[in-house]
Amino acid sequence: SKTMLLVEDNLELRFFLRSIFISNFNVIEAVNGAEGLDKALKFVPDIIISDIMMPEKDGITMTEDLRANMATSHIPVVLLTAKTDMDSKLEGMELGVEDYITKPFSATYLKARVENILTQRVKLQQLYCANLMNIQPVAEEEQQTQPEMSSHDRKFMEKLTELMEKNMDNGDLIVDDLVQELAVSRSVFFKKLKTLTGLAPIEFIKEMRVKRAAQLIESGDYNMTQIAYMVGINDPRYFSKCFKQRFGMTPTEYKENAKNKR
């Protein structure tokens, strides 16, 4: 199940929030922004709900710290506030806060907002997967309705894609090689990649390889054995199997299909 971090100094409100989400989430609690940041780094939750006004570190400062850290920059944050003033709202929105909810709020509304945010995340994963290797350019009007990715997350994905490009023909590439190059911990890498693309690292590597293979087949410049080696899958039968799993047809059928489309 998904993990939620609640950051709230008021015991009653924290208890109320916990009661709303405990049936659907593994709920972790923190009493101020400093503890919230520590727990976010330790548990890397799927979503954070935080108050703004808190001792030691307020919600806005905590969000700034979360956004500045590669390990937590992808986590959606919902801020709760008693303040209706526009300044803190704008400040929150500039940080890429997913939502801003003014107290008092209804449990139903908060629940619906959280569901909506996590659904948007899944859309972002699907979009990102479709666009790995730039296979399907996104239409401009579609782009405007897409959820935004933070600059940290974009950098992470760009660097990862670049590493895959460089190592495409390296059949010995393993997940640890990517982790080392990206200079993050293994657990952060797994969680971040899964959050951003919906794929586990091994699936991601395979996805990149077969998508590149599809591009090479479409180019018509190479035979299947050459293509298999170029994408680092040195066993032609295994190559055919991976390809069929992804595209629902063998590489040869895909080639025929591509020819007919021209």
What are these regions (language model features)?
Residues 195-234, 257-262:
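Terminal helix-turn-helix DNA-binding modules in bacterial transcription factors
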Residues 54:
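Receiver (REC) domain active-site loop signature in two-component systems and cognate sites
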Residues 175-204, 230-250:
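Basic/polar phosphate-binding segments, predominantly the helix-turn-helix DNA-binding elements
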Residues 15-19:
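Charged docking surfaces used in two-component/phosphorelay signaling
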Residues 105-114, 118, 126:
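C-terminal output helix
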Residues 29-47:
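Acidic, metal-coordinating helix/loop segments flanking the phosphotransfer/catalytic sites
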